[in-house]
Amino acid sequence: MAANGRASVRPVERHGAPPRPAGRSRSVAPPSRRPSPSPSRARPAAADNDGGSDSCRVRVAVRLRPKNSEDLAHGADFDSCVELQPECKKLKLKKNNWSCESYRFDEVFSENASQKRVYEVVAKPVVESVLEGYNGTVMAYGQTGTGKTYTVGRLGNDDPSEGGIMVRALEHILSVMSLETDSVAISFLQLYLESVQDLLAPEKTNIPIVEDPKTGEVSLPGAAKVEIRDLEHVFQLLQIGEMNRHAANTKMNTESSRSHAILIIHIQRSSRIEDGSNTSLPNGTDNLFPDNLPLVLKSKLLIVDLAGSERIDKSGSEGHMIEEAKFINLSLTSLGKCINALAENSPHIPTRDSKLTRILRDSFGGTARTSLIVTIGPSSRHFSETSSTIMFGQRAMKIVNTIRIKEEVDYESLYKKVEHEVDHLTSEMERQQKLKNSEKMQLEKKLKESEASLNDLKVTSNMQIENMAMEKRQLESTIKRLMLDLEKEKGKNNILSEQIIHLETSLDENKQKQLENISNTNILADTTKSHEKKIRELLKQLEDERSRSASMNDHLNVLQQQLSDAQNYFQKNIACELEKQLSRTTEEFASQISSLEERIADLISEKELVYEELKSTQEKMQQEMRHRQGLEDEILRLKQSLADNCSEESKALCGMVRSGSGLGSVPFMSKSGKSRELLSSQRSNISKIFEEVGLPNVLALLKSDELEVQIHAVKVVANLAAEDVNQEKIVEEGGLDALLSLLETSENTTIHRVTAGAIANLAMNGSNQGLIMNKGGARLLANIASKTNDPQTLRMVAGALANLCGNEKLHVMLKQDGGIKALLGMFRTGHNEVIAQIARGMANFAKCESRVISQGHRKGRSLLIEEGVLNWMVANSSAFSASTRRHIELAFCHLAQNEDNARDIILTGGIKELLRISRESSRDDTRNLAKKALNSNPAFFKEIQ
């Protein structure tokens, strides 16, 4: 928006030292604020339990806007009220050429500081903290036209180097995070006319602000929450928001924001509790979760561009713009009150006074890391606005936040995960049961098939056995037949053997006969060969029959052994193996079913424990919230009681201030007409407040930045000062200094009136009179008298000065500090009660002065005459009420006792007044004093003659 005429800062990059804690150079470091309780959790800690926390002070930087066209138009006549010392992190605020004050901040940016350096010093530490899981806030505050929107909301479309904190923060976050596992979403809102509106969805207006009763976290449930895709998407969303934001043209800024802009960046990052970490879980739940417990880091970053405070006479706002300015100033005032209360460690922080303070509740005094950049202009024409902005930053530096990481177990997702696992295991168990039943049926089927096969095998075996037996019988019969054949062959062989023997014998005989019958040789040889061949064939056939018989015997033995083995195998081994396999399968399924049932029981137990833990945690949080609400109600009741008591006591303030200097104890301000019983009751209430609250706490309220608190506190002090027993305590505790400081700094008429009354009561004591004068009390009272025309305030001031006039040691100082002139000057009001106090003061002064002169401690004309009081007395001695006339007559008579005053009395016509007093005065002592003066002074006697 700065590109459209908003105030801007020239980007010149400079590198400074890292920021350090700072405060005003003439004061000590800001006091630490005690951390407030918060439902969030810090590392290291359990998923849902609060752990340790870190205290972090609000970091404040100041940025000076360059001269704008209006400043440059003055040329050499331009008067700057700001002098920067960036290297010392200081700035000097010049009220005039001889008076200036120095302030220290965490960082001071000159008009040449670049946008990049401002981001790295102010916002980058907060963004990095948000990425670690902490909440964070970056906020710009300052007068309209000093460059807040340029610093925070500049998009930098034409020149990326001019990009503001919003763009740079989102660019930083997107460069670090992984959008696959993490998520980034933004909401862009504006607070316009005390109504929260959505800049990304303009139709959404008057969005409610909701506070979580358990954690106290503030949320805006009706606001649009847009998931970020990339940097280009970011620019589109920010441009849409800027176009929908309200702005107007004023004398101080051509594009003045008319609403507070709030960019909320929601970050969610996944995390896990690793083995061996210091993370602890609730008692009794250590074994319920896996080793790596899924966690979620949730954090949010608020970047706030506040609308500038403005004065109608300077901005030139008209019509509806006046209404806008009123709401802007009201919300900024509420924010200032909260900052003041936090800086002063007030027990009550008025965050509910406006929607802005409700939204920023966590940013100041809460659990967020906060950086504030205040922007100022150089022109002395806006000195008061610049001073107010600087003091706002100084007070913010005193605030200490307790930052916490919001790291928690997502019990809902964990419950869903466990429930899903239970369902999965249940279905798995059912599937396994079905599978078991199916396999059991299959095994039973296989068993039946095996039994059938076994039966078939038995039948087959029996048949084979029968066949083998039949074959055996056949073989046996064959063997028997072969044996018979063999026997026959043996018989034949025996016969043949016998024949061979016979033939051999015959051969021998034939050999013998061969010689005898050569002719028969061939026949014999052929017959021999034929017989030999036949013998060989018979021998071979015999061997074959023997071999066949042995083979048949072996085959028969093998078949018998196979039959026996088959019977044993099928009857024992196969059946036993099937039974073992069936038993083993049954045991495995039973074991699996038992394991699944135990796992399901454990998961159900885990589910019940998680539910009970959640329920117990909710009950504890509800009890804590009820206890906290009770304490807050009790505090509000006590504060209301204190305010009511203070209000009642303030009504009796004027009636409790007494006169002094030996003129009696008649109250010089009392015209209330209240009864003694009411006064006694009021004093009893004051004593009760004094005992319950304590004087130091009451005096501390005098320094409060809230006007109503100051008024009530000074009324209580004034009433306490009306009692002699309390005056010494008030002075010892610094009450006199606080009252004088309040009289000097405050511009409120009520505070002036009551403070002057309190000082008048303290001035009843002689020792207090000297302290009041030495601390410049008379000068301050005279200053108030010259600035106000309020009769009641002037009555209080005149009463205080009248009491001081009763101390002769202070007369010279009273004259030098303008006290006598102030008394005489208050006659201009014409108010009878004011004039009565003036006359009482003159009487006190003249009486004490006369006593000192008569004792020889002083000579010369009266100081009253030197200030022109005599002429006033002569002219007005008979113009007022009886009591006022008595005081004037008494003062006149005491002045007449000093012979050095005779000439002035004669010249002013005072002889006639003395003669009148000596005859007509209502008091005998006054008439006697007048006669004494006339008779004892030769000059008077001569004048009478």
Curated annotation (Swiss-Prot):
Annotated positions binding ATP: G142, Q143, T144, G145, T146, G147, K148, T149
Motif D-BOX: chain residues: 369-377
Xref: SUPFAM superfamilies: ARM repeat, P-loop containing nucleoside triphosphate hydrolases
PROSITE patterns found in the cross-reference section: ARM_REPEAT, KINESIN_MOTOR_1, KINESIN_MOTOR_2
Biological process terms in GO annotation: cytoskeleton-dependent intracellular transport; microtubule-based movement
ARM repeat residues: 683-722, 724-764, 766-806, 808-847
Domain of life (superkingdom): Eukaryota
This protein's record includes keyword ATP-binding: yes
CDD domains according to UniProt: KISc (cd00106)
Keyword annotations: ATP-binding, Coiled coil, Cytoplasm, Cytoskeleton, Microtubule, Motor protein, Nucleotide-binding, Repeat
Annotated Kinesin motor domain residues: 57-399
Database matches in Gene3D superfamilies: Kinesin motor domain (3.40.850.10), Leucine-rich Repeat Variant (1.25.10.10)
Location in or out of the cell: Cytoplasm, Cytoskeleton
Chief place of localization: cytoplasm
Coiled coil region boundaries: 415-644
Gene Ontology cellular-component annotations: cytoplasm; kinesin complex; microtubule
Molecular function terms, GO-annotated: ATP binding; ATP hydrolysis activity; microtubule binding; plus-end-directed microtubule motor activity
Disordered, as annotated region: 1-54
Low complexity compositional bias, start-end: 22-31
PANTHER family xrefs: KINESIN-LIKE PROTEIN KIF11, KINESIN-LIKE PROTEIN KIN-UC ISOFORM X1
Similarity comment: family membership: Belongs to the TRAFAC class myosin-kinesin ATPase superfamily. Kinesin family. Ungrouped subfamily.
Domain comment, as recorded: D-BOX motif functions as a recognition motif for the ubiquitination machinery.
Designated name of the protein: Kinesin-like protein KIN-UA
Natural source organism: Oryza sativa subsp. japonica (Rice)
Gene (name only): KINUA
